[in-house]
Amino acid sequence: MRIALVSDPYSPRVGGIETQVRNLGQALSRAGHDVTVITATPSGAQRGDHTEQDGDVLVRRLTARIPFNLPVNPYAGLVLRRDLPDFDVVHIHSGIVSPFARQAIDACVARRIPAIVTWHSHLIDATWWYRFANPLHKWERSGLTLTAVSSAAARAVEKAARGAVQVGVLPNLIEDEPWETSRKRALSNFISEGGAGTRPPYEAGPSRPLQIVTATRLAPRKRVVPLAELTSKAAERGADIQVSVFGDGPEKKRLEALIRNGAPLTLQGKVDANALANAYASADLFVSPVVKEAFGIAALEARACGLPVIYRNGSGIKEFITHGFDGLEVNSDDEMAAAVAMLSTHPQRLQFLRRNALENRITHTWTRGLDTYLDLYETARR
């Protein structure tokens, strides 16, 4: 198939949508498809309509001189209407505010082009205005296939529609490595320590605190400061814990102040995937304090390494974690603090979650999940 992937942001910008679109393009190319990424994100000083190769994927940049190099091009609409019909299918990737994606949607509606739209963001409280700016019901009636990266995100999109629409789930996927190697190593250690029942179970105690990890941007929406506060509450309840935070961002100074006041955190900074996988191999638990996370790539990577996950109700993490089997779902920060304290003092419960996470590989990988995308593309073409 000739496939166009349309996204406002793309490399060299760094973020969730950028990473997913790039990895999707590479996976489709490896499967033998002709892939073009069309983006409004500039690379270097060049502006206008130009192309470059990213491996076997063609990247077409329709860029304009916009302050702060924002991925916005008010002049791209005519080009998209002219050229998108050349593709067998168009896959448009959208956040909450994605003007370039909207131009592509309008082009596909006007030219009756087979297209899928995927929302990578949880609309949260934006639904009240989103419905006035985006005629979702008209898009669906024109033949567009509407999807989101999780059930939680999909329900929010449906809620934002002026009329009834059906939004499917097209989940994010990750590469197998380095996460699978980390899982195998952790599973071997788990068995040798008696985690499979061959020896007395591991117990956290004074010699080894419960090792908790999280990886995120240190920004208010990611709620790392509340994580520091709730883990401090867990420690006050007798939990022997140590939380390693991977990432960087504007909340760093606030976190450093909380650490000086006794919060059981260490800031590890931003590291690459290999370093993160190595850290996960020796950890016990991943915690995600984000409220209404659209998906949770960092949590998926941790789960791929065999870590159970504690997460908030309403999060897209529910797509790949089963409450009580390989993680715990909580409704508040107080419940999260209680769950952390419980796992630190009840090693058998932690062992149960850990064993399930280690012994059951995830299916949300490009090698195991790409057919979900291809099946949807074929359906859209009919």
Describe every region a protein language model picked out:
Residues R349-T363:
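A short, well-ordered alpha-helix in the C-terminal region of glycosyltransferases
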Residues K253-V271:
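Nucleotide-activated donor-binding/catalytic signature segment of Leloir-type glycosyltransferases, i.e.
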Residues K270-V271, N278-A283:
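Short alpha-helical donor nucleotide-sugar binding micro-motif in glycosyltransferases
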Residues V291:
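Aromatic "clamp/platform" in nucleotide-sugar-dependent glycosyltransferases that forms part
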Residues A152, L173:
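Carbohydrate-associated surface elements
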Residues H323-D334, M342-P347:
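Conserved acidic donor-binding segment of nucleotide-sugar-dependent glycosyltransferases
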Residues N189-E193, P201-S232, S244:
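Conserved donor-binding/catalytic core segment of Leloir-type glycosyltransferases
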Residues P308-Y311:
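Short hydrophobic beta-strand element within catalytic cores of glycosyltransferases
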